[in-house]
């Protein structure tokens, strides 16, 4: 999902040529001092700042032992960086893990099984959000081991620009009444009052009620799950009745044909060009806070075709299989500290939103609650609705994961381009793309 196809294909194809050799054979990790471990993260400023906060707290806690953390930047795409560092024997002791590629790299033996450490230290996994624990069980089939520890709880939510609603004279709904039908009603009301919104904000010349990206995996997975359609299942791109498949496609398409949204347009909720925006927690909140948007957050709409599923995901850290024996204990202490209540609180000082520990979600004075000015209930409400975004986890061969993800992305981008991108009906559109995806699945 995050990776450019050209880069990802290079990395994955290269891995295919060595998969039979056993990926854990080479390695040995990056050379450091006896009490220093390396932690590899994506090479961007926000991740570096996040890790620095956690590193400083960890080093302070273990000052007597002299434990240190050296930050290693993963340059280029994640897949390319992991492959390149592994082949060079330069994998860090601990590495950042992303939900959408975790199954692939787990299958290649890059991440160490953490169950032994969890059992030894009597870590109670019931203290954490169930879906976050499930998503870190990134093995395939009956393998239910934890190969990494989730850092923060992320799911689809709905952001509301309150200034837009006020200008339009539309009341912001409550979380309890925020159903799919209510969302459509609100979008129509915002559309009907477009002139009021434009008149109230002289800095914009275009307005749409909402943004909703159907080509983003959490969105299309959520929509089809609510229509009782499984993706990439039983040899089918869409495993469900044609009636439900077409109904879901038509519902997503209607958001554009009714004028509720502009797909791919350069419009932004932070400027007031949008009234609503469907997005994740991790990247959304820091953006709205940075731009000082007068916003509110609602859950993802419920009661879509009678169901209320919503995709969730996570970023975390895992110990690499290349971590040397003399560093494993320090690496585990770092991971378990990040996962502890103390570590979650310290990490929240980076401005990260929504920890994975249940007790901190509703704790009024929890550190993470200091970094947004809104009612944060939507970030963790209704955990029973959660579905893992990693819908390809058990699909084999894992080498096909990236190309399959990409084909779903291209499909849903084309749904909003020139009305099925030259295909005359939803049925013809579906027939073309389902065959294309299923060809990738063979």
Question: Residue ranges of each PLM-predicted region?
Answer:
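C-terminal capping/gating helix-and-loop segments adjacent to ligand/active sites or protein-protein/ligand interfaces
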Residues: 141, 150, 375-436
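Hinge/lid segment of periplasmic solute-binding proteins
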Residues: 99-156, 199, 296-301, 373, ...
